[in-house]
Amino acid sequence: MARRLLPAHVQESVTFRDVAVFFSQDEWLHLDSAQRALYREVMLENYSILVSLGILFSKPKVISQLEQGEDPWMVESGVPQGAHLGWESLFGTIVSKEENQEVMKKLIIDGTFDFKLEKTYINEDKLEKQQGKKNRLFSKVLVTIKKVYMKERSFKGVEFGKNLGLKSSLIRKPRIVSRGRRPRSQQYSVLFKQLGVNTVRKCYKCNICGKIFLHSSSLSKHQRIHTGEKLYKCKECRKAFSQSSSLTQHLRVHTGEKPYICSECGKAFSFTTSLIGHQRMHTGERPYKCKECGKTFKGSSSLNNHQRIHTGEKPYKCNECGRAFSQCSSLIQHHRIHTGEKPYECTQCGKAFTSISRLSRHHRIHTGEKPFHCNECGKVFSYHSALIIHQRIHTGEKPYACKECGKAFSQSSALIQHQRIHTGEKPYKCNECGKAFSWISRLNIHHRIHTGEKPYNCKECGKAFSSHSGVNTHRKIHTGEKPYKCNDCEKAFNQSSALIQHQRIHTGEKPYNCKVCGKAFRQSSSLMTHMRIHTGEKPYKCKECGKAFSQSSSLTNHQRTHN
């Protein structure tokens, strides 16, 4: 049997014709008496519901016809015979945000009401109390709920009519219906459920934090957060969890299972949260924004770590030395200093590292990769930190200043080394002779005295040197270059140290004093030679006869006696 619905699409403002079922005269005549009676009852019942909701402001003609027992068939123009079209729009009423909150805060169990939420729960007890008050503002809110619901679900005509209780099945077969009207509390509850709002009679509240749950089992699981109870234990590592789902996820660490696969690149993950975070690499999405500086992040954990820069919070503390860190991963890496653990090993040379980032940096030695490029001069670097230090050559920036003398440096390591001049600290000690040095580079050069290693060769004459600076100084003999000039006598030198020593002739300065006899010297080497008088040390030994001397010049003179 045909049915006609006017109009056939959902308009911005929906009228009675959008939700009512109409029949032509021919269609109406084909209904038997039971079907006509059922139609009358359903239409009148729905009219009663709409009136109880405070939606209708005038009685439609079709309702008057049904009440008077007239036939409500439709004429050819598409308008019900004698129908009065002066209905107010069912959904023309708009509720302000304040009105909505005023009503809904009396009904909703947990949180502010939001039409877009998948689930919103209203307490039936509270609902019935509001219904009993015949609150017009409450009815107004229900109207707006239905308007939003219809727009979001895109219901059309008779489909929405079904949700209001217009039983289109009446034209298929007659059925017996109860003569009694549905209680108002049930009418409201059914309406809310049809609109995607769940009503519940009972809920479960946490006494500790006030959070509300729909099931007692959910509350029990939640309360383990407060009690610290962990019932589910991993058989592999004995780690315990408060929920079985957390244990299931953890087991993937041991099994290596990675069920979540990225559709873009095929990479697999053990946890869905890891996959979601990874996918933001492809989309470029960075939904987590720092309120302090505006910097954005792909994950909430990255934002939390970053915010500690602003707060200065360092919650992760080393039990060994008390040093604190802002990130757990930094503490784990730091612990390896105490344990000596170096779990990341280079497959090329076998060298091991405390962190994977340091291993990645080390790999560039083998690959020759230099991904960091200076925009000023084009020089490339293996490490980002090296690029930053290099750029200070162009900018002249020297951010590290000595508090003792004010001298500034472009690198923190240079400042640390410089400060040893003031403190006299010499932390690098030679295992062979016990001599100590302020800088490790000086110790490395010194070691070559014992090993005899001279890795730096002069390309002009082939002479070898134990240090790079030594060969550079030597090359100036071949070039004749003497860039260091005395302002007093114009004498020039190929080493800055030679100029400094020379200038003491003019100034008379003798900064090196013997602690035994008080004699002073212009050069540290002269003081060292002098000290052998007091100590009796004779380090220069003749290979021919075994005689020893305190000075190398004395050995040279002696060796001539054997020639």
Curated annotation (Swiss-Prot):
SMART domains given in the database record: KRAB, ZnF_C2H2
Keywords: DNA-binding, Metal-binding, Nucleus, Repeat, Transcription, Transcription regulation, Zinc, Zinc-finger
Predominant location: nucleus
InterPro entries: KRAB (IPR001909), KRAB_dom_sf (IPR036051), Znf_C2H2_sf (IPR036236), Znf_C2H2_type (IPR013087)
SUPFAM superfamilies linked to this entry: beta-beta-alpha zinc fingers, KRAB domain (Kruppel-associated box)
Function: May be involved in transcriptional regulation.
Protein name: Zinc finger protein 879
Gene: ZNF879
